[in-house]
UniProtKB/Swiss-Prot annotation:
GO terms for biological process: L-methionine salvage from methylthioadenosine. In the N-terminal section; belongs to the aldolase class II family. MtnB subfamily. In the C-terminal section; belongs to the HAD-like hydrolase superfamily. MasA/MtnC family. PANTHER family: ENOLASE-PHOSPHATASE E1. Pathway: Amino-acid biosynthesis; L-methionine biosynthesis via salvage pathway; L-methionine from S-methyl-5-thio-alpha-D-ribose 1-phosphate: step 2/6; Amino-acid biosynthesis; L-methionine biosynthesis via salvage pathway; L-methionine from S-methyl-5-thio-alpha-D-ribose 1-phosphate: step 3/6; Amino-acid biosynthesis; L-methionine biosynthesis via salvage pathway; L-methionine from S-methyl-5-thio-alpha-D-ribose 1-phosphate: step 4/6. It comes from Zea mays (Maize). Residues 1-242 are annotated as: Methylthioribulose-1-phosphate dehydratase. GO terms for cellular component: cytoplasm. This is Probable bifunctional methylthioribulose-1-phosphate dehydratase/enolase-phosphatase E1. Its EC number is 4.2.1.109, 3.1.3.77. Mg(2+) binds at D281, E283, D476. Residues 278-517 are annotated as: Enolase-phosphatase E1.
Length: 517
């Protein structure tokens, strides 16, 4: 926990002292960054003086958020880096120690142009180290799907090396557009970090990648995994293999006209036949509303206290609580009914949990579609599915349709207000078995509000279609249908038992079963 008041000022002053700056922790951090620069140069990540590395000083007596920062300089040959070349900064980015100028032809010392971006990763993610690589694979990978806002890959072993991911998961890396100057990327990087709470990296189109971790070892390991995966995807592209689907089928297979790189489209009279991709809502579309309202929501509500109590000190739950605190603070400022203040951690575990439970119960009762709630619910449901206390329910026509679309080469995605993890849990544990093999990806509220047109525009960019009209969206919610239609999607409204009535003359095609498509 960060220090405060006079004690904080004293601590900062002590760390800014010459004795501390020349002490073992700072010296070791300087040497580490120099060593990593030389190592990454050999990997081809920081050639031509490009790329950069930063780490927090490893001093266990100081909270991570308050530790000093060591950054590599700009314009220096990375393979010749030494500890004396490094900049040392306070936790707020203030330079405390700068390198001494070297004779010509060396350039005057200058801190890395990545500094403001590194600071965002430190402040927004609580990182312990950040790596910026110009590895050629990080540049080429963003060119494979022009205009895409995300890079997606699934079912590859090295995905397990990325925090919070497993072999079966879909790894999603946000892509931001390059700018003439590095510092101009700061806002778009911040937006990507905020929009993708699970991400530990951001790609910059035609440029490189930023990777962060809780320690230099974690950041380095993940960076190696990202480079491996991106390089593998480029090679798969050259071989005509689709890396975005579980089965990794052929990109140019005539039975797979939907492929992310294939321009051909099937000709046919049915909606799915004229689409490269199908995007499905869950509640009221693939799954009865009653299952969500009568089974899933009550399970999360009834187990939230138990979950928070038993996992309070877990990193995953700490992140959940952090997101809830941010949402609750915003709710309090906006006068949202049911929002109650959450005491600081010093107030005691029980008091914090009591207030969180009250807020979560209020959020569930109001059926709020917010990321902080959906992420926590997903973690609670995960335990329920693991214990076999929950089993996913889908309408009987859904597995048949998914199988047929899959066999026809049509990619199917899910877009739900539930977290991506919750989506995978539901479809991976249904009464019809594991249906995830028929699904190519998952979108949730990190993409955007389901009733906003821009969310569907983002999805169309991510799927790499030539036109949004090549995407069929099926939902039970009229407002979502309007938003998707305004984004150029083809839209069908699902009529299922328990769904809300539609307005007269709504203008959309409706179905009562996927067999009608």
């Amino acid at each position: 926990m960060a220090c405060s008041g006079c004690s904080c000022e004293a601590a900062v002053g002590a760390m800014a002292s010459e004795a501390y700056l020349e002490g073992a922790p700072v010296r070791e951090a300087r040497e580490l960054v120099a060593e990593l620069c030389r190592h990454f140069y050999a990997q081809g990540w920081v050639t031509g003086t490009g790329g950069s590395i930063t780490v927090k000083v490893n001093d266990p007596t100081v909270p991570l958020a308050d530790r000093l920062i060591v950054m590599s300089p700009s314009g220096v040959q990375k393979e010749r880096m030494v500890a004396e070349d490094m900049y040392v900064m306070a936790a707020d980015g203030k330079v405390l120690s700068a390198p001494v100028a070297k004779p010509w032809p060396n350039k005057p010392p200058k801190c890395t142009d990545c500094a403001p971006l590194f600071m965002k990763a430190y402040l927004m993610r609580g990182a312990g180290a950040v790596i910026h690589s110009h590895g050629i694979e990080t540049c080429i990978a963003t060119m494979l799907i022009p205009g895409a806002k995300e890079f997606r890959v699934t079912h590859m072993e090295m995905i397990k090396g990325i925090k919070g991911h497993g072999y079966h998961d879909e790894l999603v890396i946000p892509i931001i557009e390059n700018t003439p100057y590095e510092y101009e990327l700061t806002d778009s990087l911040s937006e990507a970090i905020a929009a993708y709470p699970k991400a530990t990296a951001v790609l910059v189109r035609n440029h490189g990648i930023y990777v962060w971790g809780e320690s230099w070892i974690n950041a380095k390991t993940q960076a190696e995994c990202y480079h491996y995966l991106l390089d593998a995807c480029i090679k798969l592209y050259q071989l005509g293999i689709d890396w975005t689907t579980p089965e990794h089928g052929s990109i140019n297979n005539p039975r797979r006209p939907h492929s992310i790189l294939s321009p051909e489209i099937c000709n046919g009279c049915h909606a799915a036949d004229s689409s490269k991709c199908v995007v499905l809502d869950i509640e009221g579309t693939t799954t009865p509303i009653s299952f969500v309202t009568d089974v899933m929501f009550p399970y999360a509500r009834d187990n939230v206290r138990k979950h928070l109590t038993s996992t309070f000190d877990f990193e995953e739950t700490k992140e959940d609580i952090k997101l809830l605190r941010i949402q609750i603070e915003d709710d309090l400022q906006n006068g949202v009914a049911g929002a109650v203040p959450v005491p600081p951690d010093e107030g005691g575990k029980e008091e914090v949990i009591n207030s969180l439970v009250a807020n979560v119960e209020s959020m569930i009762k109001a059926d709020r579609k917010i990321t902080s709630l959906k992420q926590l619910q997903g973690h609670i449901w995960r335990i329920g599915f693991q214990k076999k206390e929950l089993q996913g329910v889908v309408f009987e026509d859904v597995p048949v349709a998914l199988k047929n679309w899959h066999a026809s080469g049509i990619k199917v995605y899910i877009y739900s207000s539930g977290s991506r993890e919750a989506q995978r849990l539901l479809f991976g544990n249904t009464t019809y078995g594991d249906l995830r093999k028929f699904l190519c990806g998952y979108f949730d509220t990190t993409t955007g509000n389901k009733r906003e047109t821009r969310s569907y525009f983002e999805i169309s960019q991510s799927l790499g279609v030539d036109s949004p009209s090549q995407i069929l969206f099926i939902t039970d919610v009229f407002q979502e249908a309007i938003a998707a239609k305004n984004a150029g999607f083809e839209v069908i409204i699902s009529i299922r038992p328990g769904n809300a009535p539609l307005p007269d003359n709504h203008g959309f095609r409706t179905i009562k079963s996927f067999s009608e498509i």
